């Protein structure tokens, strides 16, 4: 009886949390404005390089295709959160001394493409859409426990920006690639 009561309580908490996120998304849409995401992403990469060089000797390489502006309708701190969560994930699956690459580019069809590529172990699953589901985690025990919410939050924030995200394994080498495609303004 106590166990079923606790299960119901946890289900209510999850439902309340989901509703809170939906409400936040609705409010966030009102706060959207034209922003250049390039300096935001570059700043996050610089901050991480200062931390990770000391922590795991991981180097994060940043590159853009030379365009001056990468303008989207968005919310600055949410873009930071997307990049931060993805870098945290890449770092956690990377060994000491490995590299992570962050690229931003514009396409001819009015899209802005952000890629985060690591040299870690890559994804185990063939269907990488699973990794964006709430509470999904495939981490080996050696990586410690995680909530399985990080990539789900990323997916929700990407959706908020009317963007898309795709996870793939690198074909020629070990590692994973995350690609976000934003509509350009």
Regions found by a protein language model. Give the residues of each.
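Conserved micro-motifs of the catalytic ATP-binding
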Residues: 25-30, 69-74
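A conserved beta-strand-to-alpha-helix junction within the catalytic ATP-binding
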Residues: 31-49
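Short conserved segment of the HATPase_c
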Residues: 123-135
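Short alpha-helical Gxxx[C/S/T] motif in the catalytic ATP-binding
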Residues: 150, 154
């Amino acid at each position: 009886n106590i166990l079923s009561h606790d299960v119901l309580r946890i289900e209510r908490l999850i439902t309340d949390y989901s509703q809170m996120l939906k409400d936040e998304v609705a409010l966030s849409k009102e706060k959207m404005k034209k922003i250049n995401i390039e300096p935001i992403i570059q700043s996050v990469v610089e901050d991480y390089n200062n931390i990770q060089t000391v922590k795991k000797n991981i180097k994060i390489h940043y590159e853009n295709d030379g365009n001056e502006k990468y303008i989207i309708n968005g919310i600055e701190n949410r873009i930071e959160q997307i990049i931060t969560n993805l870098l945290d994930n890449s770092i956690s699956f990377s060994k000491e001394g490995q590299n992570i690459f962050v690229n931003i580019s514009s396409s001819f069809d009015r899209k802005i493409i952000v890629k985060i590529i690591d040299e870690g172990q890559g994804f185990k699953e063939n269907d990488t859409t699973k990794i964006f589901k709430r509470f999904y985690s495939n981490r080996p025990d050696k990586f410690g426990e995680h909530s399985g919410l990080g990539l789900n939050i990323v997916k929700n924030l990407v959706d908020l920006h009317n963007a898309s995200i795709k996870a793939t394994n690198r074909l020629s080498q070990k590692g994973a690639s995350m690609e976000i495609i934003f509509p350009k303004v």
